[in-house]
Design a protein with these regions (language model features):
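His/Asp/Glu-enriched short active-site or ligand-binding loop at hydrolase and phosphoryl-transfer sites
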Residues: 146, 152-193, 233-242
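A short acidic, helix-capping loop that chelates divalent metal ions and anchors anionic groups
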Residues: 108-113, 207-211
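Active-site beta->alpha N-cap acidic-glycine motif
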Residues: 26-111, 117, 121, 128, ...
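Charged helix-capping and loop-helix junction motifs
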Residues: 91, 118-122, 177-184, 214-220
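A cross-domain feature marking catalytic cores of carbohydrate-active enzymes
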Residues: 51, 78-80, 102-104, 142-144, ...
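Terminal accessory/targeting
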Residues: 1-50, 61, 65-75, 186, ...
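Basic- and aromatic-lined ligand-binding clefts that recognize polyanionic substrates
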Residues: 132-146, 151, 155
Length: 242
């Protein structure tokens, strides 16, 4: 009986460890277990502001104004369905010289989807981009950061580099601009100590639909740009890193 019980416990422990490893590989933004993904460059004085889930109406337009005021370029990972609904704003983002990346067509958790659905989401988004802004994306960020080998493989087959991040603003939570800016400042400081650049995850939209309020994110962006620039930080788009 002890042997049977012991074997069951060992099997359960192994299953738990395997599940934990899979979760880490699929969900931790800096994990490379499922294959190489672009995180950041090696210069600790470089940072990339990246904005997910747009375009989002006046919020995105105001963000473009803030970036222009600070002479900064950013990377926008846009949802295809939002681009379809607001093509004029997506064109404004591109015309302002910002880098546009693919964030899927409808923002599902791709790690749980079939291979056919993954390809449909990525290729559909790029088809919208080609129609609206005249070019497919060269970079892809998985919604929620959730990926598995098939997600990364499909992105590469479609000519895109998978991109994750190493600074999380946590701006999807109902927190203040000061809290968001503090999260970013701490992330940048950690990366500088480790001798690497900072890839900052922010949001100008929301995958639940258009009109998501993001004013704290915009205010935090202005704060971070002013403070980091004063400290000698340079802001780049993710294509500077690969």
């Amino acid at each position: 009986m002890q042997t049977v019980v012991g074997g069951a416990i060992t099997a359960a422990a192994a299953a738990g460890a395997g599940a934990g490893l899979w979760w880490y590989a699929a969900m931790w933004p800096q994990s490379q277990i499922f294959g190489p993904q672009l995180i950041a460059g090696r210069d600790p004085m470089e940072a990339a502001l990246t904005f997910d889930d747009g375009p989002n109406g006046d919020t995105t337009l105001r963000l473009l104004d803030i970036l222009a005021e600070h002479d900064a370029q950013a990377t926008f990972f846009l949802i295809g369905d939002c681009v379809r609904q607001q093509p004029q704003i997506a064109r404004r983002v591109a015309e302002a010289g910002h880098l546009i990346g693919n964030h899927s067509m409808t923002h599902p958790v791709l790690a749980w989807q079939s291979a056919a659905r993954i390809r449909e989401e990525l290729s559909g988004c790029n088809a919208i981009f080609e129609d609206v802004i005249g070019a497919k994306a060269r970079y892809f960020r998985p919604p929620h950061g959730a990926r598995r080998p098939a997600v990364l493989r499909t992105a590469r087959e479609l000519g895109m580099t998978p991109v994750l991040w190493n600074v999380t603003a946590f701006d999807w939570n109902p927190i203040s601009a000061e809290e968001i800016a503090g999260n970013i400042d701490r992330g940048i400081a950690t990366n500088r100590r480790k001798g690497r650049g900072s890839n900052i995850l922010l949001h100008d939209g929301g995958h639940m639909g258009l009109g998501q309020p993001r004013m704290p994110s915009l205010s935090a962006t202005a704060q971070v740009l002013a403070k980091a620039r004063a400290g000698g930080m340079r802001f780049v788009t993710v294509d500077a890193w690969g």
